[in-house]
Every structure is written in C-alpha cells, then in structure tokens.
Amino acid sequence: MKTIAENWPPVRGDYVTGKPDSRIAVVTLASHLEAFPNAAIWGSSKTENLGVEKIIVNVISNSNIRYVLVCGTESRGHLAGHSLLAIHANGIDEKGRIVGSQGAIPFIENISREAVDRFQRQVTLLDRIGLNDPEEIRKIVEDYRDKGEVYPEEPVVVCAPKKRQASFAVPSSGDVIISEELVMDSMAGIICLAESL
C-alpha cells in the first residue's frame, strides 16, 4: 500500500519536512521553534481556518502520520490550537463551522467533511499548547516517531475547489448617461464611450 501521496506535502505553508515515514507531525502554533528532523513535518499555524485546513490536508496525504503534537504559544484571537483540538474532537457543522471553536473565524471552506473525518480517524492529537521547551518537544518527537502502525488506508489528496473565473462582460446598452461622452451599462457594470455602442 502506498503511504505517502506524490508531491507530499501538497499544500505550501510555514513548515519544514523531516522524515516522511515518521508517525508524528508538530504544529508550533504562533511560536517559531527549531525543527527536529525526526518529525514528518514541522511548522507553525496562526489561524483557525486556513491554518487548520493546511494541517489537515498535509496530514491526511501521509498515512504514516498518526500523531500531531500541538505545542507553542497560542495565537491571540484566532486560537488556532484550540480550533485544531475542537475540529478533531467535534468536526464541523453543516455550514463548515468548527464545532466548539472559540476562534474569531472558525469556518472551514476549502476541504470536505470527509477530509475532516479522515483526519479525526487517522491521528491522535497531543495537546501541549503553551509548551515551548525545545528539549521537552524533542523528547515527545523521539517517543512518538516510531509509535504505532501506518494508518491502514491510502493517503488522501484534497483538491481545493476551483476559483470562479472572472468573466468579461461586453456592454450592450448605455442605460445610464454619465456625460456626453460616457455611458454606463448598469447590468454589466461597465462604463464606456457612448460612440462605441
């Protein structure tokens, strides 16, 4: 069984990769701490929406990761760590809101409920919010890097929804006169020269 998605990790962010076959990933929240190479991936997360989404996408695309250490200083207002714990424990509601999150904007918009469910099943979160001691963090990474088995399903690659392409409207009428030379097509929202219509 393939355990790591091609081009892992699929989403860019403020992280470094270490041993892709390690069982532990490290999220340092708003702290920037020196990475230890025995973690699969190591980085910060300051927001309760896009930051949490990136963590989920990068974790579920590597079935080797079974633990996520949440450490470092919590980001004010956004509460990325609290939101990560909440989404793991409670999931999201029908509107994409992280159930139980106290973050400022706790909405997941770019990944599916299935991706969240997979994250909940695949990993155990190690809640050490506030821990900034490099030696203690290194010890946790060493304790968990080989612990347990690979998640028994292929990695999942989540594609972000396609952005709506901007369309260019051609004015068909000048129903609002701005001046002798300029008119506006109020349906298209375009101002153009009166002589061009």
From Swiss-Prot:
Report the domain of life of the source organism: Archaea
This entry's Gene Ontology molecular function terms read: methyltransferase activity
Record keywords: Methyltransferase, Transferase
EC number(s) per UniProt?
2.1.1.-
Give the top-level enzyme category: transferase
What is one process in the GO biological process aspect for this record? methylation
Pfam families the record matches: MtrA
Which InterPro entries does the protein's record reference?
A: MeTrfase_MtrA/MtxA
Task: Name the protein family.
Answer: Belongs to the MtrA family.
Task: Please give the subunit comment from the record.
Answer: May be part of a complex composed of 3 subunits; MtxA, MtxH and MtxX.
- What protein name does the entry list? Putative methyltransferase Mtx subunit A
Species annotation: Methanosarcina acetivorans (strain ATCC 35395 / DSM 2834 / JCM 12185 / C2A)
Gene field: mtxA
